[in-house]
Amino acid sequence: MTGNELRARFLKFFEDRGHTVVPSSLLIPHNDPTLLFANAGMNQFKDCFLGMEDRGYTRATSSQKCVRAGGKHNDLENVGRTARHHTFFEMLGNFSFGDYFKKEAIAFAWEFLTKDLGLDKDRLYVTVYTDDDEAADIWHHQEGVPRERIFRFGEKDNFWSMGDTGPCGPCSEIFWDNGPEVGCGSPDCTVGCDCDRYMEIWNNVFMQFNRSADGTMTPLPKPSVDTGMGLERICTVMQGVKSNYDTDLLQGVIRHVERLSGKRYRENEKDDVSMRVIADHARATTFLICDGVLPSNEGRGYVLRRIMRRAARHAKMLGFAEPVLYRTVDAVNEMMGGSYPELLEREEYIKKVIRAEEERFAETLDRGLAILNDAVAQLKGEGKTVIPGETLFRLYDTFGFPTDLTADIVRAEGFTIDEPGFEACMGRQREQAREHWKGSGEEGIAAVHKELHNRGVRSVFVGYDEKCSYAAIGSILRGGSEVAEAKAGEDVEIITDRTPFYGESGGQAGDTGTISTGSAHVRVTGTIRPYPDLIVHRGTVVEGTIKTGEACDLKVASVDRDATARNHTATHLLQTALRRVLGEHVKQAGSLVAPDRLRFDFTHFAAMTPEEIRRVEEIVNTFIMENDTVHAREMAVEEAMESGATALFGEKYGDRVRVVKVGEVSAELCGGTHVRAAGDIGSFKILSEAGIAAGVRRIEALTGMGALRHIQELEDEKRQIAALMKAEGGDNIDRLQKLLARQREMQREIETLQGQLNAAKSGDLLADVREVNGVKVLATKVEVDDPKKLRELADTLKDRLGSGVVALGCEKDGRANLLVAVTKDLAGRIRAGDIIRQLAPVIGGSGGGKPELAQAGGSQPDMLAEALGKVYGLIG
């Protein structure tokens, strides 16, 4: 039975028993900052279990995409080395939200395994929580499991909780006996042993208590069930294999790697580990990118980067010199695309993101490995076996080596890594970064706003149809606390029962304006929306005293609102134009819509060409000139999706959504404010296009008068440049070309003179050459205006020597610089890198390089003479 057949069979089994089949959620958990990735089937049902969400069904079943590669589930270093560890896996599950409980859950699990799949009951064992007599009796009396096959374990193994407080309850696990041939051989081996003989295949969690802060547990009024069975594990049972990597779920990728590498699986254990690593990481990488994660140096993106770079290193170990991970996407999609069609829809985009990251890492991999190998060699010579935190940080910060990748590489040499030292370096860097941090705009919900919302304080937004409104002041906040009144000069937050002010959300900046009563005036400098139905005006009382309960007039700053609306509608048109020019893979990855500009982040794998930017500008301006009417309509989310409206990738929407349409060219789910017709935008001009992360580009643009003023500024600059270059008739390009040609000519003259100067200088320096063990050696301090010129001088000296070693030093800006060069005929016997490593500590620095050329820098220029004097003693 294939993995795809098993998945379908499981879902059908529970669908036939009244369960709603629910698609897997994205790997990026929605509105759950406690989770890096979805790592269990119950993640998407968390609010259902807590009684905070009613989905219209009380029984559900799913096959959930999961990733475990960070936090307490960080098994990355074991992936590929064991039979069971994975970064990506699928969790089959059935769930009851106050519907059935232990009797039914146990019956379903036993029936599916023993009757539907036909597993041998004599090879199945169960565990229960030590105090859960109820579950033990159900297993024995209802399902006929002998008492000796029912094992009891404590809270560590068989009790589940959502946190320190909240829903919790006992677990009951089902184990499969793989047979004594895969066990540890101990006569005491039984369920619970760490060996591979007894393998957990299904876990049933019975949520029946609520744990309070003092540890007291009270029964839940509606107990629930959460179960999970790893698809990869049940596949090993059904396919009669001992390793998850031998199932068809992963063998397809391994066979693909065999074909690409020309190597055979199961012929060399080292190669086997690399093939398993690539097979697992290819699945994780493909699914993560498909679900919107992109490689970066923080958060989820950093986990993805670690996975990809570990796979890239193992590909190199298999002999691949060119990027190959992107080529495994075909094999992953061949196996998984039928169940997850989004993989096929985004296949080309996924490949391009992977290849771009592989090429980026390839640029630094060899250099980083050279640094690491030098460090290992030096530490071995000193009798040490721990890679220092400073070295780890340099490899991470300069060459993109995650610490677990470094640990993986040096393990074979018997080395470990100094993780605390690395964290200390990272902490110093974070502290420096924090000094320059200006905030991300993603503020958490303040406690006072939560309290007001829980108390029932609400705001109705009426700003789609009006910019002025009359309302009652429901609450005034000052310094994070609720007050009855506020006086002139005080900063406040004001909540009214209705408001025309748009609260910052969906990338659109909040409105500004004024709030007035008969005796007070407030200047509103910003508006936020901590909850969909709670809008908070922020500002300063500029006159009088404003009081809770008073009636007030609210007036939005019309000029800013209109400018923001122009930019927001233009953003919608921009997305349409980008998809037409670049392709359907373009998805919104973020945006900012403010009165003075717009910013749009989107998924794309390469920098846009000038021609592509020009075409996008032309398309958007054509839409503006066509002046289509802008319509907004609320509808059911299903209707909106069926109509083809564009949704923000990964966003979770309610039952009702607002769809904004611009003629027939754009339709998006959007709650923002817009112009009435496209022509109101006036004009559109792109200011810049740049990459902000792997696979993510950013466009900044202007509309209306802002675009016109920008063009006028460019014309002014052009006139100023023409005047500076004395370009007749404003022919800047012709004049500039002539100036550049003259500059190149002068540069050639300088280089010729520099060569003559070096030759003359080298003639003087050669008088200091000594012969050591049959090798001509020159070690001397020189005066140069730029340390980079040490290399040019060394090349000249090597040519004049014919065969020998040149060591040069110079002082510049209070720093010592050293360079060692070895002629090619001696590089096999004398290594420049070995010499420089001996000299660098003398000048208080570090260095490295290749056999023929190495450099070092240090903080003690007064020690240059001593360092250079050591060179002669290092020539063997």
Curated annotation (Swiss-Prot):
Class of enzymatic activity (EC top level): ligase
Alphabetical list of CDD domains matching this protein: AlaRS_core (cd00673)
Catalyzed reaction equations: tRNA(Ala) + L-alanine + ATP = L-alanyl-tRNA(Ala) + AMP + diphosphate
Enzyme Commission number, as recorded: 6.1.1.7
Keyword Iron-sulfur tagged: no
InterPro entries named among the record's database cross-references: aa-tRNA-synth_II/BPL/LPL, Ala-tRNA-lgiase_IIc, Ala-tRNA-ligase_IIc_anticod-bd, Ala-tRNA-synth_IIc_core, Ala-tRNA-synth_IIc_N, Ala-tRNA_ligase, Ala_tRNA_ligase_euk/bac, DHHA1_dom
Residues annotated as binding Zn(2+): 568, 572, 670, 674
Cofactors (names): Zn(2+)
GO molecular function: alanine-tRNA ligase activity; aminoacyl-tRNA deacylase activity; ATP binding; tRNA binding; zinc ion binding
One Pfam family named in its UniProt record: tRNA_SAD
SMART domains in UniProt: tRNA_SAD (SM00863)
Main localization category: cytoplasm
Protein origin, superkingdom: Bacteria
Gene3D superfamilies: 2.40.30.130, 3.10.310.40, 3.30.54.20, 6.10.250.550, Bira Bifunctional Protein, Domain 2, Threonyl-trna Synthetase, Chain A, domain 2
One CC-aspect GO term: cytosol
SUPFAM superfamilies referenced in this protein's UniProt entry, alphabetically: Class II aaRS and biotin synthetases, Putative anticodon-binding domain of alanyl-tRNA synthetase (AlaRS), ThrRS/AlaRS common domain, Translation proteins
GO biological process, one term: negative regulation of DNA-templated transcription
Subcellular location(s) per record: Cytoplasm
UniProt KW keywords: Aminoacyl-tRNA synthetase, ATP-binding, Cytoplasm, Ligase, Metal-binding, Nucleotide-binding, Protein biosynthesis, RNA-binding, tRNA-binding, Zinc
Co-factor binding details: Binds 1 zinc ion per subunit.
Biological function: Catalyzes the attachment of alanine to tRNA(Ala) in a two-step reaction: alanine is first activated by ATP to form Ala-AMP and then transferred to the acceptor end of tRNA(Ala). Also edits incorrectly charged Ser-tRNA(Ala) and Gly-tRNA(Ala) via its editing domain.
Family that this chain belongs to: Belongs to the class-II aminoacyl-tRNA synthetase family.
Domain notes: Consists of three domains; the N-terminal catalytic domain, the editing domain and the C-terminal C-Ala domain. The editing domain removes incorrectly charged amino acids, while the C-Ala domain, along with tRNA(Ala), serves as a bridge to cooperatively bring together the editing and aminoacylation centers thus stimulating deacylation of misacylated tRNAs.
Protein name (Swiss-Prot/TrEMBL): Alanine--tRNA ligase
